[in-house]
C-alpha cells in the first residue's frame, strides 16, 4: 500500500549559519555603526535586541534575507510581540517552528478527510502518515495540502510504493 509522510523539519545548522552572517553584516554596515543590535539563538527561540523599532525592522529584513539564501523558509519563524527593554531599546522573541504541532496536524487531517480523497491519514508524533491504494491518490493529496493556507513549511518524504 503506497504511503508518504508529511513533516516539518527545520535545519538548525543553517539557521546558525544565517545568524552568523547577520551578525557579521550588522558589524560591517554603516547604518548600524554605534548601535547595539544582536541576534541570539537559544534552543528553539531567537532573541533580537535592537536600539529602536526601525533597527528591529531592518534586522527582520536581514534575517529573512539570510535565511532565504540558506534555503530556510521564512515560515519557520513565529514572531512574538516586541517588548521594551532598557532605555529606548527593543527586544523581540522569535520562536522557531520544528515539527507539526497537534492543532495543525488535526486541521490537516480534517481537511484531507473532508476533501473526499480515498486515503488514510494517521498522526505519528510530529508527522503525518498518509496511505492509500493508488499512487495517484497520494499525489493528489500532496497537491491538495500544498493548496491549503498553512504558514509553516511542509516537506513530503518517504514516498513508498
Swiss-Prot record:
GO terms for molecular function: nucleotide binding. Keywords: Nucleotide-binding. GO terms for cellular component: cytosol. Pfam families: DUF520 (PF04461). InterPro entries: DUF520, UPF0234-like_C, UPF0234_N, YajQ-like_sf. HAMAP family: YajQ. Nucleotide-binding protein. Belongs to the YajQ family. This is Nucleotide-binding protein Plav_2177. It comes from Parvibaculum lavamentivorans (strain DS-1 / DSM 13023 / NCIMB 13966). The lineage of its organism: Bacteria, Pseudomonadati, Pseudomonadota, Alphaproteobacteria, Hyphomicrobiales.
